[in-house]
Amino acid sequence: MDELLRLIGLWDDRHAGLAGYSKGMRQKILLLASLLHDPELLILDEPFSGLDVNAAMILRSLLHSLAARQKMILYSSHVLEVVEKVAHTVLILRKGRVVAHDSVARLREVMSESSLEGVFTQLTNPEDTDAIAHRILDVVAA
């Protein structure tokens, strides 16, 4: 465990209580703990949340390495740019229902989109986000 704490930059803070850690520091500890028993299935909820850029890059590489070792990784994320770089297969939900389940490349091809965000927009038909943003600014300025 000592070596793991050094690798993720928490060695100097190893004696601090978990409550004293930042969200990103807690996230690193929880991710390490989830790997300790070498699970075949790893379930992560928003694993990139709260991580600094370097830690997120390490996690992305770690997830790729785990997948290469035939580990199944199931994780939720609202950050589509990260999902696009990490996930082999995605499941897109709209109001609790599955609207797509395929590889990122296949979804982009079928939907004629260059990004996962474009696929998501087509499949979920979200509200006009630009109009909402402008309305918020109008209300705040008033």
Pin down the residues of each PLM region.
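Catalytic Walker B motif of ABC-type/P-loop ATPase nucleotide-binding domains
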Residues: 42-45
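Helix N-cap at the start of a conserved alpha-helix in ABC-type nucleotide-binding domains
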Residues: 53-55
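A short, surface-exposed alpha-helical micro-motif characterized by mixed small hydrophobic
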Residues: 83-84
